[in-house]
């Protein structure tokens, strides 16, 4: 089971943390884990390379934990509206996509110990 916690401040998404393995397939052959990893790195690369903003990310392979946050999504840290909206939009889009997948979870054959859970924490950027 993968737990994904999105971070939001004053209604604006600025990051997330993914913990665990989806468990749909064997480790290293799980298409859902591959999808989450690909989207995560897409977000990191887009923030850094496309928008030229800073992104803080940590990968702990032993604990199967990835944390991604960017101050550029928040108005108190980023003056350029275009960058801020683009960065926060990446996080919001990822959240919405996962929520949509959960609405249609009957399409996937997860066991009781596999799958993913999505939550949102309202908290200031630390």
Located regions from the model:
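N-terminal intrinsically disordered, cationic/polar leader segments
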Residues: 1-30, 45-126
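Alpha-helical support elements that line or immediately flank enzyme active sites
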Residues: 35-38, 42-47
């Amino acid at each position: 089971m993968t737990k994904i916690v999105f971070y939001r401040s004053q209604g604006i998404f600025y990051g997330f943390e993914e913990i665990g393995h989806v468990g749909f397939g064997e480790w290293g052959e799980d298409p859902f884990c591959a999808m989450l990893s690909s989207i995560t790195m897409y977000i990191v690369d887009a923030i850094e390379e496309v928008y030229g903003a800073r992104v803080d990310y940590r990968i702990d392979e032993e604990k199967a934990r990835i944390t991604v946050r960017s101050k550029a999504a928040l108005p108190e840290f980023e003056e350029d509206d275009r960058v801020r909206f683009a960065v926060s939009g990446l996080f919001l889009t990822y959240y919405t996509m996962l929520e949509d997948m959960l609405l249609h979870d009957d399409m996937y054959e997860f066991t009781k110990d596999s799958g993913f859970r999505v939550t949102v924490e309202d908290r200031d950027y630390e």
